[in-house]
């Protein structure tokens, strides 16, 4: 059977699109067409009599089943798809390549929406950081903010609207940006370009489709390496319920976070480890687990204070929590973000409540083969339980290989050992 053929044509929101002769010839001789409802409304008058139209709607699997049927019965005729802007710029051509990798694809692009908005603003865009929030969650946008990208182009959707974006930025203290919004770009009757403060944008509604360009008001922003302990909100004002800054930074080093993807912070308390990790390594997916309900507000307050969006907070007993490997699901743990919980390749155990081995055993059901577990053992005459002995026993019983411990005495605080463990087959 011949492989499927696609001709994917980019269009703007203009109600009377202009096409070069080559593209007009493709349309005139086409038999099977596809696109969204908006695209159909724009090109309907150009379609030949008797043309078949396949709507692009969710679920996409249904759309591609129709494509497979059409390709099978079309005797080699291409499926002509209309898509927004440049079909290879976060566009439908990428979806076709992923879903039907053997298909033959020809693309006729036009300007994408962010290019059109930059043109209207007479703004160079070679230095623009691009983030797509169309059908995607916040992580890449969070990363762009934390890394203080000076110019961010954003593709929006009905959930990630300009107002929602502005509200998120204000919530986490990223106020030093102005927002440019383009609505219905390419449509001479409906096109609108606005330049607003974040406060103004957060209170307005914008028609779809739209896109956003954020421009930082300041070119430089300094961030300290290590957040002072006194800057955090604490649990009941108890300064001992926070991993101290020098220990915190050494713990992050032991976790090897530049080369990790998913960090679990078990016993997060104030969120200091998660927040420090979020700001220093914004590529990470971070899951913070804490049994005390009152800590949820503390972690959220600290995350907002230090501009650390995207920490997924889970409140409940970790040993009863639903994790990726929990089958059947036990008690669902509460997440404030609703993001899928990825399998960790870095785990910090900051609190164990006397159940260190049980926690480690559960972690091992989801830890990646190259993952690492880090635990800070505190020696204190006030604590009858020897946490180092618990760690050694757990590692031995669970078949973990230990790394070399790091011994630290910080001022007049109790001595600490930063301990690491790996799956034995990886050492």
Regions found by a protein language model. Give the residues of each.
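Conserved SAM-binding loop of SAM-dependent methyltransferases across substrates and taxa
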Residues: 270-282
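Class I SAM-dependent methyltransferase SAM-binding "motif I" and its flanking Rossmann-like core
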Residues: 14-15, 84-149, 319, 391, ...
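Helix-to-beta-strand junctions that scaffold the AdoMet/dcAdoMet cofactor pocket
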Residues: 281, 367-369
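S-adenosyl-L-methionine
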Residues: 291-325, 332-334, 338-342
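Class I S-adenosyl-L-methionine
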Residues: 1-106, 115, 283-286, 290-292, ...
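A contiguous loop/helix-start segment that scaffolds small-molecule binding in enzyme catalytic cores
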Residues: 2-8, 21-22, 77-79, 149-240
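Core SAM-dependent methyltransferase catalytic element
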Residues: 212-217, 410-427
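Conserved class I S-adenosyl-L-methionine
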Residues: 260-269
